[in-house]
Amino acid sequence: MTPWYLYLIRTADNALYTGITTDVARRYKQHQSGKGAKALRGKGELTLAFSAQVGERSLALRMEYRIKRLTKRQKERLVTEGEGFEALLASLQTPTLKSD
């Protein structure tokens, strides 16, 4: 099974874009060449701000969803300190049990 990664790219205007991939270097090059996400086209210089291995695709999708809903300040803490990443990953890996 190929591992999936979550990544954040910083645009020239300091915005953070969140995405998932199986190959961060390849995907980053696609974004830089304008062949990646439409949201990043014409945004100037792009820098890879953060990347981490997540695991399987379904978990990566859930992580991406949650991180896209964080505030800018929370995303900045994730990028600079890795704050909250492991806890978020663990919370999504833990199956929730429903009680009747």
Curated annotation (Swiss-Prot):
Pfam families in UniProt: GIY-YIG (PF01541)
SUPFAM superfamilies: GIY-YIG endonuclease
PROSITE patterns: GIY_YIG
GIY-YIG domain span: 2-77
Cross-referenced CDD domains: GIY-YIG_UPF0213 (cd10456)
UniProt xrefs under InterPro entries: GIY-YIG_endonuc, GIY-YIG_endonuc_sf, UPF0213_domain, UPF0213_GIY-YIG_endonuc
Database matches in PANTHER family: UPF0213 PROTEIN YHBQ (PTHR34477:SF1)
Family named by the database record: Belongs to the UPF0213 family.
Protein's UniProt name: UPF0213 protein CKO_04549
Source taxonomy: Bacteria, Pseudomonadati, Pseudomonadota, Gammaproteobacteria, Enterobacterales
